[in-house]
Amino acid sequence: MSLVQIQLKTEDFKIYLQLPVRSQQHNFIYPLLFQEYIYVLVHDRDLKRSIFFANIGYEKKFRFQIVKRLINRMYKQIHLTTYYSNYSNKRTIYGLLKSFYYKLLSSGFSFLFEIPFFFKFISERKKILKSQNLRSIHSIFTFFEDNLSHLKYVLDLLIPNPPHPEILVQKIRYWVQDASSLHLLRFFLHEFCSVKSLITTNKSKRNERFLFLLYNSYICEYESIFLVLRNQSLHLGSMSFVTLFERNIFYGKIECFAELFAQDSQANLRLFKDTDPSMHYARYRGKSILASNGGLLLMPKWKYYIVNFWQCYFYLWFHTERINISQIDSHPFYLMDYISSIAQIPSMVRSKMLENLFLINNDMKIFETFVPIIPIIGSLAKAKFCNLLGNPISKPVWADFSDSDIIERFGRICRNIFHYYSGSSKKRSLYQIKYILRLSCARTLARKHKSTLRGFLQSLGLKLLEEFFTSEEQIIFLTFPNASLNLRGVSKGRIWYFDIVYINEQANF
């Protein structure tokens, strides 16, 4: 099949997906699994790196004969479930799980579930461009700086594990009307997928695209019902969910939610009417926060509502310990690898009016963010850069690389950590991490050359120091070559970047 034919097939597929729901109700996704070009698109390098998440590593070996053989099996109705007729043959089952047929079929199936939302994203890209910076993780902290300092309480929520596969299929059927595709999804969930693995943050050899799709459909269902107080609908497509794939969720202010929901449940939400409805919600991965400036009765009511929601709608036993209610000004909260809190000592802002006619002193609360140094040192110790006390050690695994490669690896990790935690209010912890990585790099090089650490540092000198410069330090060093090497005073202020779309697990150790 030529590239021109594949492109024409893709255009036909796009037109097919844009048909009204009634026209594609019986032939929505399942018939497309019998088309060869779908598997070509899955394997194609350009589409592997989707805009939704990074490359997940498909099989490098691709043969049209395998695809045609799989399609012929499906045409002849040789179902995968027939392999399970003999459960005593465990080798056959294991071979089926690891077979290339299953990988092709699951990859094509998840690809077909993803593309409709991709076209929806393209059709609304003009709206996205106006708020493109909101895709960055750091954008949510700028939102916190403007709004959380004026609020009183925060509800810290750990989202439960996904429910039973059958319940998950029942929830997905609200936005997928193809019965055949749902049966195939049920087969994948019951026979191949571990539901607990849907929320794991570790890299796995499983089909990550398929797992991310299922997990985000579960989150979408939860948040659409969770925002029923605002929209009076049980199956809401949230404004933030232009696509249903993992990225930081950015919500605006929820205003007047009591009036929107009062018509349906006046008795249950009677106490909400007398409170200030200013409320903010944010989520990343399996953790979310709900902040409000309401009274003492508002947040416990929300906690009671959330617990009953998980138990009644998803049939999950939700432990109340997973929800914590605290005051923002006295208890910090942990979100997106940052420790956030409100400064105990407010900042004084003095306003001058009409040339010394009078002065106005305003106390302003400052939103602060800190680096979680203990978890980062734990990650460094797990990656064999230091011990649990933070003392640098050599990394023998990298001793076989060249000197420039070793220095570049350590320097890249250091720069990535500095880049992500550039919004920290205090940079002292970051320089401690830089010290650990720099000394670990020197110990690794000294181990490679069978030299002492002191002698190696004296011979290497400035070359080792320059590789660990951050982007801000590099600009100053190039502009002022005679500047002091002690650059700890550089970039004391917080810097938020709008090019960070995911947490890279402490620079991919």
From Swiss-Prot:
Annotated PANTHER family: MATURASE K
Subcellular location: Plastid
InterPro entries: Domain_X, Maturase_MatK, Maturase_MatK_N
One GO location term (cellular component): chloroplast
Pfam families named among the record's database cross-references: Intron_maturas2, MatK_N
Upper taxonomic lineage: Eukaryota, Viridiplantae, Streptophyta, Embryophyta, Tracheophyta
Alphabetic keyword roster: mRNA processing, Plastid, RNA-binding, tRNA processing
Similarity-based family: Belongs to the intron maturase 2 family. MatK subfamily.
Organism: Cuscuta reflexa
Function recorded in the entry: Usually encoded in the trnK tRNA gene intron. Probably assists in splicing its own and other chloroplast group II introns.
Name of this chain's protein: Maturase K
Keyword Transport found: no
Primary subcellular site in the record, as a coarse category: plastid
Biological process annotations from GO: mRNA processing; RNA splicing; tRNA processing
Superkingdom of source: Eukaryota
GO molecular function, one term: RNA binding
